[in-house]
């Protein structure tokens, strides 16, 4: 039986100085119960906590670590960059190279580097409003675009985990121009544009939602969004903060090929450091300050540490890396289904490229209502049983599982061997 005494001690200390003891709500384990392990190191596919317990990590820092923890190329790039200076407050060649890397892989013509996915989506929407002269934004229930006020309405990720409709502190005025529609419902989109098409600046959607669990777009959904927005003079923003450079070298765009007006990126492009970007057509991006009048800025945007880690990650994420991750995800998802089926546990595993979510329901999940209808208590029991056996899953039912190039056969064997006991634990929950 693993011990967690040090983590308990650290969690108690943290709660005296940090709200809830964590700096991002889902880390507090409120959705699954228990005390979160406090991590001290990561190497390859493994995490080690303060009590010396090791875990196969299927979170990968919520997506960024596509090469695994402490990949030598990333560590070397960071050490070299840090030795030269951590921040200059001035342009660098590395940020040009990272922008070139993003442009070469996606349909965007220019990008602006920022520090978080929230900044990226917030800035993209400001640009869309400035470019169109319109105010309203269409988003979809269960899609998560960061914690900017106007986009927290019916959001996924932590907002879904804690069953919040939005958040206290988000005023009616700040969300008044946000139109929330059910996901995967083109008829609802057409109706919104029929009613207020000349007021809608943009539609923003996760290219493949993975923050209410993985709920892929129905065939042709993103393409239809592209057609509707173009017809009405609105812009389409596809959010690839999570899927970008993870599900393929070109993200979800590489799998589907729908080119929006603007895109947002994050996670993998920072290699585990705070970094994100938004980009799009040159005529739109040139409306940003200092070329245009739409203001956007950031003290640490494009900082040398994040750009070094991002470049090292993208340059080492070879086609072989993606093939390996695809195979790892396929093996584990099949094993999960086999274990749950053996115990008679209703479930549905939904994929978005090499991302997947195990929904504890027997029906296809196509929208936020379907995701919320699952048996989250069963997920909590499954999670705790996996954690006790040294497998670190997302501590919430509304998230994706992540794999890396470092998840070798030994790590995957450990995951698979833990599944029967976890399935039994889930089966005991009504």
Swiss-Prot record:
Keyword Ribosomal protein: no
Molecular functions (GO terms): glutamate-1-semialdehyde 2,1-aminomutase activity; pyridoxal phosphate binding; transaminase activity
Main localization, broad class: cytoplasm
Any one GO cellular component localisation term in the record: cytoplasm
Cofactor: pyridoxal 5'-phosphate
Enzyme Commission designation: 5.4.3.8
Record bears the keyword Transferase: no
One GO term (biological process): protoporphyrinogen IX biosynthetic process
Chain positions found as N6-(pyridoxal phosphate)lysine: 267
Gene3D superfamilies, per database record: Aspartate Aminotransferase, domain 1, Type I PLP-dependent aspartate aminotransferase-like (Major domain)
UniProt-annotated location(s): Cytoplasm
InterPro entries linked to this entry: 4pyrrol_synth_GluAld_NH2Trfase, Aminotrans_3, Aminotrans_3_PPA_site, PyrdxlP-dep_Trfase, PyrdxlP-dep_Trfase_major, PyrdxlP-dep_Trfase_small
Pathways per UniProt: Porphyrin-containing compound metabolism; protoporphyrin-IX biosynthesis; 5-aminolevulinate from L-glutamyl-tRNA(Glu): step 2/2
Reactions catalysed: (S)-4-amino-5-oxopentanoate = 5-aminolevulinate
Subunit architecture: Homodimer.
PANTHER family: GLUTAMATE-1-SEMIALDEHYDE 2,1-AMINOMUTASE, GLUTAMATE-1-SEMIALDEHYDE 2,1-AMINOMUTASE 1, CHLOROPLASTIC-RELATED
Protein name: Glutamate-1-semialdehyde 2,1-aminomutase
Organism: Thermobifida fusca (strain YX)
Name of the gene this protein is made from: hemL
């Amino acid at each position: 039986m693993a011990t967690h005494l040090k983590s308990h001690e650290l969690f108690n200390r943290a709660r005296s100085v940090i709200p809830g003891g964590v700096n991002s709500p889902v880390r507090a384990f409120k959705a699954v119960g228990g005390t979160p392990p406090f991590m001290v190191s990561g190497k390859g596919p493994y995490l080690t906590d303060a009590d010396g317990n090791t875990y196969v990590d299927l979170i990968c820092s919520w997506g960024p670590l596509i090469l695994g923890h402490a990949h030598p190329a990333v560590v070397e790039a960071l050490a070299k960059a840090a030795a030269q200076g951590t921040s200059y407050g001035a342009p660098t060649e590395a940020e040009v190279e990272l922008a070139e890397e993003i442009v070469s892989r996606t349909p965007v013509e220019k990008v602006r580097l920022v520090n978080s996915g929230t900044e990226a989506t917030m800035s993209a929407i400001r640009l869309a409003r400035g470019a169109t002269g319109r105010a309203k934004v269409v988003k979809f229930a269960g899609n998560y675009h960061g914690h900017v006020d106007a986009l927290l309405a019916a959001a996924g990720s932590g907002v879904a985990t804690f069953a919040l409709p939005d958040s206290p502190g988000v005023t009616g005025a700040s969300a008044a121009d946000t139109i929330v529609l059910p996901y995967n419902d083109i008829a609802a989109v057409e109706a919104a544009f029929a009613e207020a098409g000349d007021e809608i600046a943009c539609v923003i959607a996760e290219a493949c939602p993975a923050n209410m669990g993985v709920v892929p777009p129905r065939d042709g959904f993103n393409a239809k969004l592209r057609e509707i927005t173009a017809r009405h003079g609105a812009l389409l923003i596809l959010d690839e903060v999570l899927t970008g450079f993870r599900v393929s070298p070109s993200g979800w765009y590489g799998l589907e090929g729908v080119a929006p007006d603007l895109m947002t990126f994050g996670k993998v492009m920072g290699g585990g450091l705070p970094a994100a970007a938004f980009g799009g057509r040159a005529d739109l991006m040139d409306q940003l300050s200092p070329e245009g009048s739409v203001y956007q800025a950031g003290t640490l945007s494009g900082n040398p540490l994040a750009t070094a880690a991002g470049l090292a990650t993208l340059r080492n994420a070879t086609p072989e890396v993606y093939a390996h991750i695809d195979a790892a995800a396929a093996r584990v998802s099949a094993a999960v289904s086999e274990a749950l089926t053996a115990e008679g546990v209703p479930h549905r595993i939904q994929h978005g490229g090499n991302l997947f979510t195990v929904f504890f329901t027997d029906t296809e999940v196509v929208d936020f209502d379907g995701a919320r209808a699952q048996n989250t208590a069963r997920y909590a029991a499954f999670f705790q049983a996996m954690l006790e056996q040294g497998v670190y899953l997302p501590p919430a039912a509304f998230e994706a599982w992540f794999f890396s190039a470092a998840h070798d056969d030994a790590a995957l064997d450990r995951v698979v061997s833990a599944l029967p006991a976890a399935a039994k634990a889930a089966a005991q929950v009504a």
